């Protein structure tokens, strides 16, 4: 399960070049390298699962027009999460014949991580609510229990838990 990520705040005009490089390195390149280096172990074991953690930011905000626009509120994070989703589906297609599943699981709320706790302390955003991490855990177990045909999916934890009664 690939779960490491960072958020780079700022607008296109204000973001530092090194921060763009950093979010690519951590949020997209990191999971791909982890998968690359774990792959021989899954092949040796005769199969397994990769679950890449994405975010609803991969599809947010959707088509315009937009109201109440806040500049610099996640375009870069959404960009790398969308890239991770696309890469995951491509790799699912490549690895299915080796009995290796690749799926994407996104929390639908904010999980209580150090980064989200920091955001919760932001005076501009004082009332963030957190999602219990157990829904991600239950959804992860369910995904891993599925047959090899269940690969290349982009899933959302709360929807999956509700749909499957987890």
What are these regions (language model features)?
Residues 2-3, 49-55, 61, 101-106, ...:
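Structural signature of the Rossmann-like NAD(P)-dependent dehydrogenase/reductase core
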Residues 6-8, 13-33, 51, 77, ...:
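Catalytic Tyr-X3-Lys loop
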Residues 104-105, 122-166:
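C-terminal helical subdomain
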């Amino acid at each position: 399960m690939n779960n490491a990520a960072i958020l780079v705040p700022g607008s296109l005009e204000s973001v530092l070049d090194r921060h763009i490089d950093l979010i690519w390195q951590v949020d997209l390149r990191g999971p791909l390298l982890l998968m690359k280096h774990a792959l021989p172990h899954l092949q040796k074991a005769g199969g397994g699962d990769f679950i890449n953690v994405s975010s609803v930011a991969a599809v947010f905000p959707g088509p315009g027009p937009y109201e109440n626009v806040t500049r610099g509120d996640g375009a870069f994070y959404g960009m790398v999460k969308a890239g991770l989703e696309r890469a995951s589906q491509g790799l699912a297609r490549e690895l299915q014949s080796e009995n290796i599943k690749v799926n994407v699981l996104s929390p639908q709320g904010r999980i209580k991580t150090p980064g989200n706790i920091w955001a919760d302390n932001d005076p501009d955003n004082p009332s963030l609510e957190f999602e219990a991490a157990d829904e991600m855990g239950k959804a992860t177990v369910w995904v891993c229990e599925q047959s090899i045909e269940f690969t290349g999916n982009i899933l959302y934890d709360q929807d999956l838990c509700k749909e499957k009664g987890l």
